């Protein structure tokens, strides 16, 4: 059989398919057109903006016909790897070292317009093989069936880890017939919105997915606030700990272990530093370096008109030509780490936009640790299609070095929860509601360059795996490291140490993987780290600094500290960020002094500022005092103002009166109106939410002093308009007996008892599983994903408004603590019972020092009854009309 090929012509285009969420939508289109849809907004006019005579039909195409609709960047071609009936409804895949493809089939996605039957066990994990070597898969084996909406998989040991939220399974074949006969559970809480034990229904847009074995030997996931690590022995012997919830659908890492992710309208974010560092200081809210938006240009360049997007009737959603204007379904990012495209592509990110039938290539640049993503083809895309049914949902690296595209080939991709009447009409007008059981997998290759043919047998030797750690294709390096760690291949430790310390005699990536493989095996030693700290490559030295932290809690702590401090005097900028992070783990006066010197002798950088602040929990005011008294800092002027402001902000958020009084003393020390004074006061003022006309008054939790701090009166006399303005902003935060206009202390909230205490306890569990992934355990929310709940006027105010927010969701712009958020919260009316909603709301109204009254089940029941006919989410304006 000959591969179906599409050769690139003209402008570069590639279409990628969308998240699993979209399959739910297919069935929705079959419902009666005149009926109001879940995604409709009250009184909203849904006018068709694209003339029907310019909208082409959308017939079902054969793979050969679909291939002819592709326009790919010059020098590339698109080859068919698999198609129905060999594969159905694919949403994710992984290649293995033998060249087989393990594919997730989410065949239960939206079997009817209202999703009826979606919870039936019809999903599969299938294994596809190319038995004749022609590049096209020709053999299908159902490895594991009977799954309910499976999302993704990860190769592990002699089987696979399967994400079937809320369960995470391990399955393997023990008798050699290619079908799983052992299936054991690793976790039963692998989801935020899909847990039958708690009465929640699935929302495919917000279920955990994409478990990824990262460079640091932890397994991270998209849309999930926990990371996992295998402890050896049994395949179910895992530990887990909280982490940042990343993105929505899809997760990838680069050669240095940095994680990349995205969400529908936010095409690319990255963790520039490991997120656990920023979590060290609970008052660093939010720290800069994790979940950083690295692509800010949201425009897309599709190959066809795109009226079939959910808000296509809104001005600005489509261009005047009727094409998609900005991202609305970004998903499935992958950092290209193969060797088939050529070195100039290594480290670039490819991502899907299925509603626009395209794939973007983002060129990644690094300047002093800051990553920036830009479209590699300005005004065009890497791959596009004129076939409206081309829906790539995921992208993957593979052992042959090519780029694989998972195409959920169908017309309907929007979930019925968000479906609008407009989109339903679009679907029905072109017959896009069926079929719903097709699917293709494509391979993008660069012409004129060989495609990798490397393979390993069923039981590769340790020597073979160690050799693969230096392979030019990152897929092989990752796979070899994971397999060595899974085997507990301690016998390979001497080879790994030799590779790690080989300097320029071996590839940088090979040395890096050798170090992390030793860490995963528990065979890393200080001698190896000492050698790595002298490596010619800053990336290796930085990794060695990070790895030294594993010795700080054991008997070799002092020796590890000495190794780190030996590097402190001559660290180039490329390595300095990691040194500052590691010094924050050591936490001694000496390391803080080193951090101060490093900051004062380098260009201002928010990354470095927050790296230091993250390691100063509880000691920010001491560090700030050392800066104010440092003559070098005094000459830095505004370049280091964010550092002083950030430290002051943390002290203010900590709420300790003694530390805040000292902070005010420090603010009064510099010359009146000096930049240091303004920076410190600005940091404090930034913690006080600003009231906005027509919006709920933000909650200000004052800090109570026994008497008026002396520095306050001194600062009020400063002859500076800016200082006077800042003092006025800070004033609501400061309280003391007899202060004019200050209300008397509110009586302490009575401890919850009886039914209320039980409700709070249940709410604690619900929050962890349902809410915490987005709003985070600390309640401070996440940039680009969820606003804060801690001290939120919406949480502590009207329980009638709060009940409606949870029942029906919120859309469009909403102000929280003086900051505007343009984010959509899904409705939970069908997902949670009245008692569960009351429990969760009681928790957030009494956690984090809150003292609002608990919410009763009857309150939610009454709110549900009063809004029984409502099918729309709420806007801020509507909520403000509710007492």
How would you label these PLM feature ranges?
Residues 406, 427, 431-438, 444-765, ...:
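Long, ordered, helix-rich scaffold segments
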Residues 41-57, 746-758, 816-823, 827-883:
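Flexible coil segments in periplasmic/lumen-exposed cytochrome c-class electron-transfer proteins
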Residues 19-27:
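Sec-dependent signal peptide recognition
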Residues 37-465, 475-476, 483-485:
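Beta-propeller domains with acidic blade repeats across secreted/periplasmic ectodomains
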Residues 427-429, 781-817, 822-834:
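Gly/Gly-Pro-rich "capping" loops immediately C-terminal to redox-active cysteine motifs
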Residues 680, 756-782, 795-808:
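Sequence/structural segment immediately N-terminal to covalent heme-attachment motifs in c-type
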Residues 446-447, 775-781, 807, 811, ...:
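Detector for the c-type heme attachment site
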Residues 395, 406, 441, 763-777, ...:
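The canonical Cys-X-X-Cys-His
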